[in-house]
Swiss-Prot record:
This is Beta-ketoacyl-[acyl-carrier-protein] synthase III. It comes from the Bacteria. GO terms for cellular component: cytoplasm. It is an enzyme of class 2 (transferase). Homodimer. Its EC number is 2.3.1.180. The gene is fabH. It holds the Pfam family ACP_syn_III.
Amino acid sequence: MTYARITGTGGCLPEKILTNHDLEKMVETTDEWIQERTGIKKRHVAGPEETTCDLAERAARRAMEMAGRSSADIDLIIVATTTPDRVFPSTACLLQKRLEIHGCAAFDVQAVCTGFVYALGVADRFIRTGGAKCALVVGAETLSRIVDWTDRTTCVLFGDGAGAVVLEASEEQGILSTHLHADGRFDNLLHVPKGISTAYSEVLAGEAYIEMKGNEVFKVAVNTLGRIVDETLEYNDIDQAEIDWLIPHQANIRIIQATARKLKMPMDRVVVTVDEHGNTSAASIPLALDVAVRDGRVRPGDLLMMEAFGGGFTWGSALLRF
């Protein structure tokens, strides 16, 4: 049986850091209030000339270096992003050009905070069916471009960054299953209400911002993530005690803690980066994975549960042997 196995990870965070104390000077908020409700202490913000593809490229090169792979080896590129460099071509095509990779399929996936899990699921299916042997899967965002920095309910949450993995065909166990879902009935609870075909002038003027009904999102997210955890465990016929690490989307420490309780996992078996990164949307899971791999927590053979929830609503999970 052919599996899709992660052989390299990479991450990239912009140099500029925005702390909670910095935000205290911008909006009516406090460091204590932000930490108590979100767990976030700081977030990274892209520079004026820094783009999503810039971050994606750095993360991708680091993942390829860890995997020992060159541009000639990559035969599929998928970038999960909500903040592409251009309307078209895709950020994946722009990344392909920078990496001097020619001819393979390259496309973007847009599932907001669930984007990386969606992209991982797509790449897994390519590899399992023989459509690819060495895929580059990236989650990259510059959410600071679509944050209203006068809205204290949202501007404290989000950060910029990119994470990447190299996924290769292998006889060894890798991705065991992915589970992808969406329900568009909840679109107005978390969204950017303006787009190219509905409000082009506002988009052009830079007036398209994230809007969120936080309490309602929280309630749906906690219940939905509980269900996706059950679905993943049941599908693979395993007990939660067998999972070595939970690597969740880094949205909010309270949501992360709720999912950990569902799995009966102590927080020291949960990879948490939301305090340092904020919510980087599609980048959060691969960034967290890269941090945990490079600091030695996640080791070969570990069983990992990834789960995410995002605008749409979208949600999903991946169970994999690292």
